[in-house]
Design a protein with these regions (language model features):
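N-terminal glycine-rich anion-binding loop in soluble enzyme alpha/beta folds
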Residues: 2-95
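Metal-dependent catalytic neighborhoods of phosphoester/phosphodiester hydrolases
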Residues: 129-130
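Glycine-rich beta-strand-to-loop/alpha-helix junction loops that act as flexible
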Residues: 118-121
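Residue-level preference for the first positions of well-ordered beta-strands
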Residues: 33, 114-115
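Short, well-ordered alpha-helical microsegments
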Residues: 125-126
Length: 137
């Protein structure tokens, strides 16, 4: 677990859209990192739409390769991760959504994984930092 699907076994355009074709799992334990989407744009100051960011990043990441030819390193030989899906935010409700973001990030941290967070608007940094501060301060 924790490594992407082999594109020789399953074409890149097939399957559930996850970041870099990682396994999808809400259980992050036993992994080094967990990708977490935060499709939130309630606090955007001009034009909404960044809520579609996590889906667009996942879609584009399906063609990424884990091997870097210049450095001769495959990231998944050194770490493993999962795509933990998106936080179920509540459009239009800032405080309640922040509580859910905070809880989701805390859940990843409690499982011993590093959260890799894709957003959303700039405001999602606050609940993320609140969750991180509980273990790093």
């Amino acid at each position: 677990m924790g490594v992407p699907v082999n594109s020789l076994a399953s074409p890149r355009f097939c399957g559930v859209r996850t970041f870099q074709r990682l396994p999808h799992s809400a259980d992050c334990s036993g992994n080094d990192f967990a990708v977490l989407g935060v499709p939130f744009d309630t606090a955007t100051s001009y034009r909404p739409g960044c809520r579609f960011g996590p889906a667009a990043i996942r879609d584009a990441s399906s063609i990424l390769k884990s091997y870097h030819s210049v450095l001769d390193v495959d990231i998944f030989e050194h770490c493993q991760g999962v795509d933990a899906g998106d936080v179920d935010i509540i459009p239009g409700y800032l405080d309640e959504s922040f509580e859910r973001i905070d809880a989701a990030v805390a859940g990843v941290l409690d499982a011993g994984a590093v959260p890799v967070i894709m957003g959303g608007d700039h405001s999602i940094t606050l609940p993320e930092l609140r969750a991180l501060s509980l273990i790093h301060i």
